[in-house]
Amino acid sequence: MTSERLVILSDMWGVKKGLWITSYLGYLQQYYDIAFYDIQQLANIDVEIKSPENLHRAFVDGGIDTAVAHLIKKESEPSHYLAFSTGGTIAWKANLKGLHMKSLTAISPTRVRFEDLKPCCKTKLIFGENDAFRPDGHWSEKLDLEMEIVPNFGHELYTDEKIIGKVCQHLLSAVLEREHKAKKAG
């Protein structure tokens, strides 16, 4: 059986502060054919002083749109997506612009709160309860989307080993479910 493809989009820090990404890769690489994107590179962002404010501004002032365009150019095969923070917003917007996705698991994509349309795929959103910028319940009801709110965590919950394990378990259970269905059908 061939592996399903999983595209992973980093948060705004990319690989610079992304040692936690290796934990996701460790869990998932034997079950998925993985493509990883550092969203700073996708967005052509090269700010001299990489403070959170400067990086955030660079993404908001055109970087997100650039990354969306580059992602659409690079990805043509329908795949599953796992995306973090701004990477989740990029994946969301790319899907709305026609990038075909089998599923989207987005953790802390707070800027999606400004979106009026939802992706055309199975979507799982996860936010920390203490993330001041997460969308509210009214937004998720309006878009008919379920949000998982994790108690006692903030925006960067995706870097925590417990959350990493939980997210990977969700993605792996989906693989096992698909394999089970394929065996039954075959």
Predicted region positions:
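Serine-hydrolase catalytic machinery in alpha/beta-hydrolase-like enzymes
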Residues: 3-74
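Short, conserved loop/helix-junction motifs that constitute active-site signature segments
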Residues: 28, 98-99, 114-121, 140-143
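Gly/Ala-rich beta-loop-alpha elbow adjacent to hydrolase catalytic centers
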Residues: 82-91
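Hydrolases whose catalytic domains are alpha/beta-hydrolase-1, hotdog thioesterase
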Residues: 90-94, 115
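A conserved short beta-strand
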Residues: 99-111
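Short beta-strand/loop motif that positions the catalytic acidic residue
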Residues: 124-127
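Conserved loop-alpha-helix segment in the C-terminal half of the alpha/beta-hydrolase fold
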Residues: 134-146
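Catalytic histidine-centered segment of alpha/beta-hydrolase-like enzymes
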Residues: 152-163
